[in-house]
Amino acid sequence: MSEDAPKILGPLDVRRVMAALPHRYPLLLVDRVEELVVDERITAIKAVTINENFFQGHFPGRPIMPGVLIVEAMAQAAGVLAVESLGLAGSGKLVYFMTIDEVKFRTPVEPGVLLRLEVAFAQKRGSVCKFEGKAYIGDKLAAQANFTAMIADPPTD
């Protein structure tokens, strides 16, 4: 293997995801990572079940995952990508999202599906990273968004 070959990680279980992200129930929206190519991209999975608390009110009789949570799931996948790529695990640094652009919702996300989150770095400059994200159900595009985040220390009291 050449030194220029990308470093590929995966699959990574939820314990590794939780080591990278500060999110916990009910807002941890990445269940596992299928593949992570350091400094490039990530493919992660969110298993969407009827037991999700948001389905109680969104919508009774026609449960659909809120679009904002689909975007949050993509953002969390991007957070794992950033933490693993930049060697931030255990550093205490957090990934703070600054902008979300060009969000498009293509198809409803209903209980019983595996939502595949594909996120790639679009640009890295200092502590600021830009990402392109897509969420799929099978081969069908459910949502897409571009977002920008910065890596920073958590706020102090």
Swiss-Prot record:
Gene (UniProt): fabZ
Keyword vocabulary terms for this entry: Cytoplasm, Lipid A biosynthesis, Lipid biosynthesis, Lipid metabolism, Lyase
Keyword 4Fe-4S: no
Organism in which the protein naturally occurs: Rhizorhabdus wittichii (strain DSM 6014 / CCUG 31198 / JCM 15750 / NBRC 105917 / EY 4224 / RW1) (Sphingomonas wittichii)
Biological classification of the source: Bacteria, Pseudomonadati, Pseudomonadota, Alphaproteobacteria, Sphingomonadales
Its job: Involved in unsaturated fatty acids biosynthesis. Catalyzes the dehydration of short chain beta-hydroxyacyl-ACPs and long chain saturated and unsaturated beta-hydroxyacyl-ACPs.
Compartments where located: Cytoplasm
Gene Ontology CC terms, in alphabetical order: cytoplasm; membrane
One family name in Pfam for this protein: FabA
Catalytic activity reported: a (3R)-hydroxyacyl-[ACP] = a (2E)-enoyl-[ACP] + H2O
Active site, per annotation: H58
Listed InterPro entries: FabA_FabZ, FabZ, HotDog_dom_sf
Major location category of this protein: cytoplasm
CDD domains per record: FabZ
E.C. no: 4.2.1.59
An example Gene Ontology molecular-function term: (3R)-hydroxyacyl-[acyl-carrier-protein] dehydratase activity
Gene3D superfamilies assigned: Hotdog Thioesterase (3.10.129.10)
Family indicated by similarity: Belongs to the thioester dehydratase family. FabZ subfamily.
Protein's GO biological process: fatty acid biosynthetic process; lipid A biosynthetic process
Listed name of the protein: 3-hydroxyacyl-[acyl-carrier-protein] dehydratase FabZ
Top enzyme category: lyase
